[in-house]
Amino acid sequence: MIYELRIYHCAPGRLPDLNKRFETITLKLWERFGIRPVGFWTVMIGESNHDLYYMLEWKDLAERESLFGAFATDPEWLKARAETEQNGPLTTSISNTMLSPTSYSKMQ
């Protein structure tokens, strides 16, 4: 397994809107595509309370490219994204890191 850590750096005041989109739209679409989230986090103490962190689990990079690529071009997703960003983008930038577990990690 590999893990993808994504950090969405939200525009000021837009984190609640991003959380709502994940909860009501994105997760349902991911389930349809077979995308497996490990967890979601917001910053309690740290540099930015405007960030959403989440992690996805993949069998390999090929699965990631196939499933996330299909999701990213899905007409239902594109419509929902446009509708939820009518008042401007929810994020200012997105950080993305692919992680490989160490031999001593509980998550393999």
Provide a role label for each language-model segment.
Residues 22, 68, 81:
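Short, flexible helix/strand-to-coil boundary loops that buttress conserved ligand/catalytic motifs
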Residues 3-4, 14-16, 26-29, 61-64, ...:
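Short loop/beta submotifs within extracellular cysteine-rich repeat domains
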Residues 3-9, 39-74, 95-99:
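Short, well-ordered beta-strand segments in beta-rich or mixed alpha/beta enzyme
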Residues 33-50, 78-108:
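Glycine-rich beta-strand-turn "strand-cap" elements at beta-sheet edges
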Residues 14-40, 72:
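Short amphipathic alpha-helical segments
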